[in-house]
Amino acid sequence: MLRLQDIIRVQVELTTRCNSRCPFCMRNYRGSDYNSGYPVTELSLTQFQQIFDHQLLDQIRWQPPQGSFPHRMTQFYGVVFNGNLGDFCNARDGVEIVRWLVDQGIEVKINTNGGARTAQWWAQLAHPRVQIGFALDGLADTHGLHRQDVDWHRVIENARAYIQAGGRALWRFCPFDHNRHQEQQCRDLAASLGFEGFENIWDGRDRGPVYTRDGEFSHWIGNLGPSESADPPPLQALLDNHVTWYDRGTVKLEGDVADPEIRCVHKMNRELYVAADGTVYPCCYLGFYPRTMHHPGNDRVRELIQPNNALVQPLEQCLAWFDQVEQAWQAQSVAQGRPYACVKHCFRKPQT
């Protein structure tokens, strides 16, 4: 695995707090209130500055190659705010942290639901070194089916204020069966509002029942198959199965074969992931609070992890255990110790 001097980008989960209840997010269960062991916390400006010392800042600051055109390379970001559980707009020191980073010459990318704070707050983030990706999954009548508790009109208002202040915005669209027919309308609206780009986000989580905070069935996401019932099972039955399926040894992954080719995002992108409690991981896929959170990918990581809190020990020491993750790829299967997340997210299919 990589050493600190190899790192050129850091993904940061600034907070585990969120104003939304996306049904496929690990911070709840299908929209219902459920915490499987993550801390409710965030990084302050002082703590952030402690982690991002001068050495790390020098490494993630983009320098144009010698002889290149002197304009900014817009696709390189030294810091990406894109947490597993929380949303940037819920962090108390978010604006101050971004201002500090751009003052250090760092390119910043923020991915957010954009549904909290005022328009004036968002306008403060406008800067040539900052791009904000607003998650807008359709129009006003469909957006909230996935981004629960997020008001589409408010997101548009916040994005418009940010753009009018000179901000660079990206429309991030998750396609579902219920909103695919609106994609072109969304593209047209994005262009008319001044978004500089439109991006389709696909992560495979696009189907299942959705529940209220109190566990009552709300609606389905995704079209039902011909043999499927529109009546969902009780939430508790789904939750019990979710909690125990990994423990039953029934994990089946396409890449769980002998000698899999793992294309590690940590190594390819030369990046780290810093969670909201200051702990450090090779990537976001391994950063679901493995010491405390019940998650399919955490059991093996929990065994490998060593002291990794950058608020307690030097950042370089926090990377020392990464080599053990790579060594664990040599296990014969997930059941025998190969990290689940590495196989699920970084397995490369053989070329046919």
Predicted regions and their residues:
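Conserved SAM-binding loop
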Residues: 10, 14, 108-110
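Acidic donor-diphosphate engagement hotspot in glycosyltransferases and nucleotidyltransferases
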Residues: 93-94
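Recognition helices and adjacent regulatory flanks at domain boundaries
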Residues: 1-7, 20
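Cysteine/selenocysteine-centered motifs that mediate thiol-based redox chemistry or coordinate metal-sulfur cofactors
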Residues: 310-352
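Catalytic phosphate/metal-binding cores of nucleic-acid and nucleotide-processing enzymes, i.e., regions
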Residues: 78, 110, 133
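Local cysteine-cluster metal-coordination motifs and their immediate loop/turn environment
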Residues: 17-29, 282, 340-349
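Radical SAM enzyme [4Fe-4S]-AdoMet core and its adjacent flexible, acidic
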Residues: 13, 28, 32-49, 58-65, ...
